[in-house]
Amino acid sequence: GVKAEGIKILVEKIKQYEKDVFVVAPMYEQSASSHRLTLRRGMNCERIDDIIDGVPTYALDGTPADCVLFALRELDINFDIVFSGINKGYNLGDDIIYSGTFAAAQEALMRDKKAIAMSCKYNSFEGTKYFDEVYKYIKENDLLNERVVLNVNFPANAKGIKITHQAKSTYKTYYIKKEDNLYYTMCDTTTPLNDEPNGDIQAIKNGYISISPLGIN
């Protein structure tokens, strides 16, 4: 949600490079919300305390994709680029399809805006120390445009940067019925990860920052 540590870290990093920064983020965590829009109920939007001084911050009772569209259409923020994240946990392979973090960036791309989605190792933002190096690399190599989302994943300690593609990763998913008579979704994280050459999963496994340029089609 809007008070997540990863958002604050990202804003602090962005402020070094961009003059006008705004935050529009979900009120609550939106893990695996994918590209869902809120259609069958109303949404509440609140201007809250700046996440850091001088950065107008809005909390929307919606999904990450909602936030991008709401910022553009209702708040009338004519942004040039969307930074989404920093997600607490890698978004690699099939995870990207389910990711609300990536969906926000993809929504921006659909509106002809530049977009970067960023993720780190679960429960560790140590990899954000490479933000400056990565952003410089992106700018110097002219990777940022309105045709692709840059999906960036930071390991805690990196050997370098690799341009990658989205690999295939299928987790064993099953369901457990508990005492409350409800079913809970479980994923077997011990499933071997795909090691295909130049894939995002392989890059992270080998200790590299992964940058995957991903188009809508």
Where in this protein do the model-derived segments appear?
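Short acidic, Gly/Ser-rich segments with clustered Asp/Glu that frequently serve as metal-coordination loops
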Residues: G1-K8, N194
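A cross-family phosphate/adenosyl-ligand binding-site feature
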Residues: V11-N78
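Short beta-strand segments
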Residues: V24-P26, S84-N87, M118-S119, V152-N153, ...
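Short glycine-rich anion-binding loops that position phosphate/pyrophosphate groups of nucleotides
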Residues: E29, T63-P64, N87-Y90, I216
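Short, Asp-centered acidic motifs that coordinate Mg2+ and/or phosphate
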Residues: I81
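Glycine/threonine-rich flexible loop motifs
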Residues: Y90-S99
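Glycine-rich phosphate/pyrophosphate-binding loops
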Residues: L109-T128
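Electrostatically charged, flexible surface regions
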Residues: T128-N217
